[in-house]
Amino acid sequence: MQNCLFIGVDVALKGNQFCVMNFDQHIYFNLKFPNNPEGNDMVINKIKDIENKFFFEKIIVVMESTGMYSFHPACYLSSNEYLNKFHTEVYQINACDFDKYKKSFHDLEKEDGIDAYILADYARVGRTKALYPFRGSQYIALQRLTRQRYHICKELIREKAYVLTNLYLSFSGLMSLDKNELPFSDLFG
């Protein structure tokens, strides 16, 4: 962990705040970049500048899981060829877990970049050991399967309701018959 670069990413619609620090909490930069491929390239160029001055073997990136805003930066950073030579691990953490961890920093002032700093510190103290690294293609496949299953279940419920409504409308007269006259009253008949 000593030769590791920790990156915290505070993801937003228009821009991502990146805080890059080492194990000794030396902050190399805490800057905002656009939330697009060009912005991610700018971050990678800044990391290249750091690599020219300092030695590190591994990169750990932590970002809050914010759905569609965090998915593309996570995919980009986890699949970048330059970053992969450092055995880069990208983690997306639950917003509730992050808020609980953030409450322990009660003495920090509210300013731009503080969330990115706390996310980088989350990785620095080893909180990512209980998490699984982000794998974009696996995530997309699982997401699509889950959504397809949900869609099929909803369609099945709708079709069952449709059939039951038609049965009731077609055979509503059977409801007024006595128990002895019901055509489907015998379980074994």
Predicted regions and their residues:
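Glycine-rich, often acidic, oxyanion-interacting loops/wings at catalytic, nucleic-acid
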Residues: 150-189
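Short glycine-rich, Thr/Ser-proximal phosphate-binding strand/loop in the N-terminal lobe
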Residues: 12-39
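Extended, highly charged alpha-helical segments
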Residues: 122-166
